[in-house]
């Protein structure tokens, strides 16, 4: 034992290589697969503890995974013997201890629990809560607005100013305090109101007007004298009506308007007034300011400065002789109230099938102007010099100079600045 030959050799006798250090071989547990058929042979499968967690199961279906997991757990726990050995010598089969069996059962249960939890997470859908944005279907709710508005007229609004001046009215009807069950139409009520106002005594109206004029200028019902000067009067008394009819006689209605379409509002108002006046069947003297500058001077003279105010004359304007009636707004209002026909009832009327009664003039085509026959619309006339040989008498020097000045081109005395004259057929 103590001799040199008994020492361990460091090299192999055959290959002369050094021995490798002893390696700890990791032992693994073997699982015994029982034979299913008589022809099958028994074999052992070695599994290490580190490979238990890396087993890949089939994901085909839930029942299929459960079946494979149960088979694997049974095979893992059912083994009763373990094959041991160092790899160089013969393997020795020994029986498993109770501790090893309990560890294998615990590992199988843990693996089954992990697989079950993963499969349940995959099966449960992830539902994201959403707020409903669509109104659920149902019948619309009916709201009675009369019930909501009931009693609102009697309630004083907090937004209303306490200094608000209340309105007043006059009860002129004989049965004004009585209320009938049936409500009259609006147009009947307006006619009754107009008849009631006509029954007022003129002295009462004048005294009431004076009292309103004496109020301070800041008062909402104050009336100034300037308002009565600008507004034409149409409500005449019986005496004034007789005087007016005698003075008017058969005077014509004169309309100052424009046919230019540069300002659309002015042109449309001029057309409206022309249609209203022609519908009454009276003779209208239409004077187009854009065709003749003399009409513009006449209008300025008739209106005066109080209507102009330095701003400019607006068109159209209607006159009865030299009496001003009004513009477009006044004519519309009088026509709607039925007072325009009464006011112009004494004017000269147009006979049927005559120019001005819906028929156009054959000479001017309702333009009321034709080209000048003297200058043919050029506004210029040329006078030639005439030399008389038989005339031996010589006139004075002044007369000769005057005659020389009249020769050549001269301004046409018959037409206006546009070379036009008024139509001799419809503007007689």
Swiss-Prot record:
Q: Which Gene3D superfamilies match?
A: Glutaredoxin (3.40.30.10)
* Amino acid composition bias (Acidic residues), ranges on this chain: 386-401
| Domain of life where this protein originates | Eukaryota
Cellular component, GO annotation: plasma membrane
All copies of the Glutaredoxin domain together span 241-351
Spell out the SUPFAM superfamilies in the cross-references: Thioredoxin-like
What are the start and end residues of every segment in region (Disordered)? 386-405
**One protein family per Pfam:** Glutaredoxin
Please report the name of this protein according to its UniProt entry: Uncharacterized protein At3g28850
Q: Which species is this UniProt entry from?
A: Arabidopsis thaliana
């Amino acid at each position: 034992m103590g001799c040199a030959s008994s020492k361990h050799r460091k090299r192999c006798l055959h290959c002369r290589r050094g021995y490798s250090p002893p390696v700890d071989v990791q032992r693994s547990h073997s699982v015994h697969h029982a034979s299913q058929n008589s022809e099958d042979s028994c074999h052992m499968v070695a599994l290490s503890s580190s490979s238990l967690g890396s087993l890949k199961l089939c994901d085909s279906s839930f029942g299929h995974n459960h079946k494979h997991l149960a088979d694997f757990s049974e095979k893992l726990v059912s083994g009763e013997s373990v094959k041991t050995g160092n790899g160089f010598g013969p393997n020795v089969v020994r029986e498993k201890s109770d501790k090893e069996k309990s560890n294998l059962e615990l590992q199988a249960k843990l693996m089954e629990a992990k697989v079950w939890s993963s499969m349940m997470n995959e099966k449960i859908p992830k539902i994201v809560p959403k707020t409903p944005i669509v109104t659920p279907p149902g019948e619309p709710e009916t709201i009675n607005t009369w019930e909501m508005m009931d009693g609102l007229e009697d309630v004083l609004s907090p937004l209303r100013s306490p200094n608000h001046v209340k309105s007043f009215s006059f009860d002129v009807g004989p049965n004004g305090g009585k209320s009938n069950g049936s409500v009259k139409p609006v147009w009947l009520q307006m006619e009754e109101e107009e008849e009631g106002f006509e029954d007022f005594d003129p002295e009462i109206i004048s005294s009431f007007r004076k009292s309103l004029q004496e109020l301070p200028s800041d008062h909402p019902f104050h009336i100034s004298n300037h308002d009565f000067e600008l507004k034409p009067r149409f409500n005449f008394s019986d005496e004034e009506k007789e005087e007016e009819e005698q003075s008017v006689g058969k005077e014509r209605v004169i309309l100052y308007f424009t046919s230019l379409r540069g300002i659309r509002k002015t042109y449309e108002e001029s057309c409206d007034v022309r249609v209203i006046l022609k519908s009454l069947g009276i003779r209208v003297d239409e004077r187009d300011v854009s065709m003749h500058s003399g009409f513009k001077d006449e209008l300025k003279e008739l209106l005066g400065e109080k209507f102009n105010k330095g701003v400019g004359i607006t068109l159209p304007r209607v006159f009865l002789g030299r009496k001003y009636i009004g513009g477009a707004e006044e004519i519309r209002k009088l026509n709607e109230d039925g007072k325009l026909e009464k006011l112009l009832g004494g004017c000269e009327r147009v006979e049927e099938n005559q120019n001005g009664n819906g028929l156009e003039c054959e000479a001017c085509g309702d333009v009321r102007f034709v080209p000048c026959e003297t200058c043919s619309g050029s506004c210029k006339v040329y006078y030639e010099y005439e030399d008389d040989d038989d005339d031996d008498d010589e006139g004075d020097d002044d007369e000769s100079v005057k005659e020389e000045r009249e020769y050549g081109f001269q301004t046409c005395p018959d037409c206006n600045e546009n070379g036009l004259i008024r139509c001799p057929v419809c503007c007689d």
